[in-house]
Amino acid sequence: MTARHYTAALFLAALSAFLLSCSPEACFEETNAYLKATFYSNDTKEKKTPDSLSVKGIGIAEKIYDRKEGVQPGLFPLDASGVTCSFEIKINDVTDTVSFHYTSYPHLISKECGYTFYHRLDTFFCKNESFYIYVSSDNITTANEENIRIFY
């Protein structure tokens, strides 16, 4: 093998290694950790989808749900830079304000997806006690698991 062929082969090997190492992989995993609320009938204690759901974050102009039908479960975004999020929740014709107190911590999802923030639910407060809320899991992650049950 001549020096010229050797140099060309080395160049091609280096180029292909460079191109293969720089190919970005796609992220196909969920990257948002929402507080997941399943809705239940307060009378029968069975899972029941509300006829109408409206949710607005206190201090946020845009509604999360606006008289939405068929929501089950409800997904509530938490602010990783804060320790409290409050929501005005209207289920059918009953409205109440619920505040969630939590701590946030970074979590590596994968090399492709990077980091997100998971949360641990500490306490909650229902202003008018219009709904009964049961905490089924205080770990708020990207997994598809229920965190709270709202009985209405």
For each feature predicted by the language model, list its residue ranges.
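Short coil/turn motif common to extracellular beta-sandwich-like domains
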Residues: 29-36
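Tryptophan-paired
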Residues: 49-94
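C-terminal motif of bacterial Sec signal peptides marking the signal peptidase cleavage site
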Residues: 18-21
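Glycine-rich, aromatic-bearing surface loops/beta-hairpins
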Residues: 106-152
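Short acidic/polar inter-strand loop motif in beta-rich domains
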Residues: 91-109, 117
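Structural motif
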Residues: 38-47
